[in-house]
């Protein structure tokens, strides 16, 4: 019988305090170290691992450059523990624009980066989408072709088209909001489908690309104003940190209710024949009534606010330091 070569990987689930970079980096560092102690060689942190995102204008002051404290944490932990480590953060470029940038390091060396293609809902207030030529391919590690995707990129068919046939593994993560809990009846009606989407879209992408996915996430409760509406959002981030194989099968998983922690699994870092063609449509799944409404309303309001308050602004002097190694 032939032995199948596998790699131990970890997807991290973080209880994030939105906007508190110092706290979040310390929590991420602790989880990375837990994963390393458990033998993980590849470790995924989620989208916005350093700050989280909500409609909180002060987040502008937490935007870093590509060599800021959050990138330094990724690099130093990857180097110290000799692992592959990735995550995304709000990153200001030299031209003054801001991107949601995913960086991946191998043993302390930058493998590559990817800027999320389109901001989701009120994220539009803090960054703009990546360049059209950015496929999400990060590079090659020991012969393994590595790609990434974050959050609603898993919901768009374009992501599967970009990565199909080009990667052996996808390392990424999400920052996926629940339906507002303000109205219990509406929440109980709409939230099950939203929560299902937050995991099934990742499984669908794995199946359509034919590559395993290491998917990190957040699981915190939070509230914030709703842009353009006289309401306060009260809800949570969905959790769903997971390791998924190239057939879309769930190997290991952590729910919102299970809180922060490490999802560990052994996977084969190798592309397989995709299970189905990529659907000929924009969205992989129906978004649901409230997410679709928010996509349009908060996208318009957010883009306007970004142009007026974020784009072109000079980076503030960093007052946050990466946790001591």
Which positions does each model-derived feature cover?
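C-terminal beta-strand edge segments of enzyme domains
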Residues: 211-212, 217-325
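Active-site catalytic loop in hydrolytic enzyme cores
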Residues: 66, 92-200, 257, 274, ...
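Short beta-strand scaffold segments in enzyme catalytic cores
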Residues: 87-89, 100-104, 137, 241-243, ...
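Extreme N-terminal starter segment of soluble prokaryotic enzymes
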Residues: 4-11
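Cys-nucleophile CN-hydrolase/nitrilase-fold catalytic domain and related Cys-dependent amidase chemistry
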Residues: 21, 25, 29-111, 176-211
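CN hydrolase (nitrilase-like) catalytic-core segments centered on the catalytic cysteine
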Residues: 66-86, 155-261
């Amino acid at each position: 019988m032939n032995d199948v070569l596998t790699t131990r990987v970890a997807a991290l689930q973080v209880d994030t305090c939105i906007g508190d970079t110092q706290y979040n980096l310390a929590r991420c560092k602790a989880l990375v170290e837990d994963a390393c102690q458990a033998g993980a060689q590849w470790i995924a942190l989620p989208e916005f691992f350093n700050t989280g995102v909500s409609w909180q204008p002060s987040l502008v002051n937490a935007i870093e450059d590509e060599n800021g404290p959050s990138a330094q944490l990724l690099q130093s932990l990857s180097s110290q523990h000799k692992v592959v480590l990735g995550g995304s953060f709000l990153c200001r470029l030299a031209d003054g624009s801001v991107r949601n940038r995913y960086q991946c390091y191998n043993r302390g060396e930058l493998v590559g980066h990817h800027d999320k293609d389109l901001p989701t809902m009120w994220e539009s207030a803090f960054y703009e989408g990546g360049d059209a030529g950015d496929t999400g391919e990060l590079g090659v590690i020991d012969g393994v072709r590595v790609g990434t995707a974050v959050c609603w990129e898993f919901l768009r068919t374009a992501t599967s088209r970009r990565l199909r046939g080009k990667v052996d593994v996808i390392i990424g993560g999400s920052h996926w909001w629940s339906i507002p809990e303000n109205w219990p009846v509406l929440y109980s009606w709409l939230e099950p489908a939203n929560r299902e989407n937050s995991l099934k879209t990742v499984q669908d992408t794995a199946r359509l690309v034919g590559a395993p996915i290491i998917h990190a996430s957040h699981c915190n409760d939070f509230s914030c104003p709703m842009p353009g509406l006289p309401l306060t959002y009260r809800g949570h981030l969905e959790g769903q940190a997971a390791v998924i194989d190239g057939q879309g099968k769930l190997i290991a998983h952590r729910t919102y209710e299970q809180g922060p922690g490490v999802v560990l699994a052994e996977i084969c870092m190798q592309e397989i024949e995709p299970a189905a063609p990529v659907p000929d449509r924009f969205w992989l799944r129906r978004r649901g009534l409230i997410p679709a409404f928010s996509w349009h309303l908060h996208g318009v309001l957010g883009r306007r606010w970004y142009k007026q308050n974020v784009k072109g602004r000079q980076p503030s002097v960093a007052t946050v330091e990466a946790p001591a190694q």
